[in-house]
Amino acid sequence: MARRLLGSVSGLALVLIFSVQLLAADRCQQVSAHNKRLGIEITDPRVISATVAVIEASGLKAPIVLCELHMPYINATVDHAGRLYLIGLTKTLIEHTTDAELRAIIGHEIAHIVLGHRNPMIELTHHRTAKSEQKADELAARWFGKEPMVSVLNKLRDDAARLQPARLREQAGAELEARVKALR
């Protein structure tokens, strides 16, 4: 069914997604021992279609597995297990984004891979520098337009208003606002 929905996507993008999904159907669960935030594999055709579009736009040739990210708020992340990249998306993010916004946020995560943002110290703390986030935003916006990227960043900022403690909420809001400002 997913193949029919994806229609005219390139063979390489299909191979990268479907071969990895077939060979590692439970890879998200295997890796969840390493990263407790990752859960079941995402097979939603809308997410797969957005990911294929990003892979084609980026020229990425690395295998990707899409995993549900266990967090109570809108978020996305990229992690790796060897040469395999795992993109984590929360259900809330998938449910509250348009197709264009979904491509923008997946594009942002794949931009981290393309730009080589793989500092081991950053990965240990699951934080990235503001500069690397802005560069990933800019690359995703170049692939799919500024408006979807700005829109999804605004949704992330609005959702960050639920974070506790207040210091974390204020910091996240300010960082996301700065990223929106940098794109305009």
Residue ranges and their predicted role:
Residues M1-R4:
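N-terminal secretory signal peptides that target proteins for export/translocation
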Residues V9-Q21:
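Bacterial N-terminal signal peptides
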Residues C28-G59, L124-G173:
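Short helix/loop segments within enzyme catalytic domains
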Residues A24-A104, I110, V114-R118, R142-W143:
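Peri-catalytic and regulatory segments of divalent metal-dependent proteins
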Residues M121:
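Catalytic toxin/effector domains delivered as secreted proteins or via bacterial secretion systems
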Residues L168-R184:
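Pan-zinc metallopeptidase signature
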